From Swiss-Prot:
Class in the EC hierarchy, top level: ligase
Cofactor remark: Binds 3 Mg(2+) cations per subunit. The strongest magnesium site (Mg1) is bound to the beta- and gamma-phosphates of ATP and four water molecules complete its coordination sphere.
UniProt gene name: aspS
GO CC field: aminoacyl-tRNA synthetase multienzyme complex; cytosol
Residues annotated for L-aspartate binding in this entry: 170, 214, 357, 361
Protein name: Aspartate--tRNA(Asp/Asn) ligase
Record: residues binding Mg(2+) 2: 354, 357
Classification lineage: Archaea, Methanobacteriati, Methanobacteriota, Methanomada group, Methanopyri
Length: 431
């Protein structure tokens, strides 16, 4: 390896040790008889100090030629110094330029010069070098790891369902068509139908962390056309409460893990995460409309909640909460109904965002066919899905959790694009 340590490994306790470091030139300061280079890698920044009398002439003379963001390799000696950042510096004996950067940068990775979001996304690779994006994506890694650990401990099996499908998952029109030889095909909106088929296959508990694609024309701070969804499905449930408990306990676990493992990253983002207490509060859809009406926002029965309503609910409820018993007309055909008006469906809300949706599913073949027809769809279009219900389908339910929206609540990002490496929205297909 070209390096044997990260910058974070360089501590005063290693005074006198030889190290090999590699990273990016963050800053260069030339004071004549002494020169400084700030070397950055994914763990932080360390100061390279070059007194003219203590380093080789070749190394000393190389510093003024270094351009910001060039990639360099350094061999030197750790030296404790209370005046240096972090109380430590490295005295280089050798500096090797591995890759020289252009002097004209489309944005400043040090963050000293502000840039708008579009500029940052256009130069995303440089933008991702900044401290805040680095913190966000380290947190994202901890979040997905925590999700997997939580679900695996509870007997869930990770699966990967098709992303090229022949028909709409939910009968909607928000589909991206793809060229698939001589047939029509689409990108999957969700793994929903396949999760249910796996319940019939006897898997009992499955989860997937994977992409979903929705051809929505929304161009807001909370919408993407390609996103990552965390989905589960579980068999032999008594009611939707069984899957709601898994969801609330998972979210509390994720927040706890991020607090424990991402102290430095949260500090970089100026965030303090609360300890989520379970169970979360539950209010029905009808109660939600009444509450909104009390605050001057009128929503007709059977309508989805507009953004204004979600924001107001985020002001009323400081903690995550569930909205339950959604009207039948607002939910897909596979949702189990409680009566002629409402269903077992629920949404998880937090900070004015809908984070997750779920329900107990309809497992009875004849009822499912009827509900497909009632929504103006053809059972023939779902024949392979329906086939699974003919040979013994257990009562089951599940949910889908938006990973990016969850990360918005954790990191404080105001725009969903901030928590996505290379976002895809209505106007952005590059980089």
């Amino acid at each position: 390896m070209l390096k044997d340590a990260y910058t974070a490994d360089v501590t005063p306790e290693r005074d006198g040790e030889e190290v090999r470091l590699a990273g990016w030139v963050h800053e260069v300061r030339d004071l004549g008889g002494i020169k400084f280079v700030l070397l950055r890698d994914r763990t932080g920044i360390v100061q390279l100090t070059l007194p003219k009398q203590k380093v080789p002439k070749e190394t000393f003379e190389k510093v003024p030629k270094l351009t910001k963001e060039s990639v360099i390799r350094v061999e030197g000696t750790v030296q404790a110094n209370e005046k240096a950042p972090g109380g430590v510096e490295v005295i280089p004996q050798r500096i090797e330029v591995l890759s020289e950067s252009d002097t004209h940068l489309p944005l400043d990775p040090t963050g000293k010069v502000d840039a708008d979001l579009d500029t940052r996304l256009d130069a995303r690779v440089l933008d991702l070098r900044r401290e805040e994006p680095q913190a966000i994506f380290k947190i994202r890694n901890v979040v997905t790891t925590a999700i997997r650990e939580f679900l695996e401990e509870r007997g869930f099996i990770e699966v990967h369902t098709p992303k090229i499908i022949a028909s709409a998952t939910e009968g909607g029109t928000e589909l991206f068509p793809v060229v698939y030889f001589e047939r029509d095909a689409y990108l999957a909106q969700s793994p929903q139908l396949y999760k249910q088929m796996l319940m019939a296959a006897g898997f009992e508990r499955v989860y997937e962390i994977g992409p979903i694609f929705r051809a929505e024309e929304h161009n807001t701070r909370r919408h993407l056309n390609e996103a990552i969804s965390v989905d589960i499905e579980m068999s032999f449930i008594e009611s939707e409460e069984d899957v709601m408990r898994v969801l609330e306990e998972l979210l509390a676990h994720v927040f706890r893990k991020v607090r424990e493992e991402c102290e430095k990253e949260l500090e970089a983002l100026d965030r303090e995460l609360p300890e989520l207490e379970t169970p979360f509060e539950r209010i029905t859809y009808e109660e939600t409309l009444d509450l909104l009406s009390e605050h001057g926002i009128e929503v007709e029965w059977g309508e989805d909640l507009p953004t204004e309503a979600e924001r107001k609910l985020g002001e009323i409820f400081e903690e995550p909460f569930f909205i339950t018993e959604w009207p039948r007309e607002t939910r897909p055909f596979y949702t189990m109904a409680k009566d002629d008006e409402v269903t077992t469906a629920f949404d998880l809300m937090y900070q004015g965002l809908e984070l997750a949706s779920g329900a107990q599913r309809e497992h009875r073949y004849d009822v499912l066919v009827r509900q497909i027809e009632e929504q103006g769809l053809s059972p023939e279009d779902f024949r392979h899905y329906l086939e699974a219900f003919k040979y013994g389908m257990p009562p089951h339910g599940g949910w889908g959790l938006g990973l990016e929206r969850t990360l918005m609540t954790i990191t404080g990002a105001e725009n969903i694009r901030e928590v996505t490496l290379f976002p895809r929205d209505r106007k952005r297909l590059h980089p």
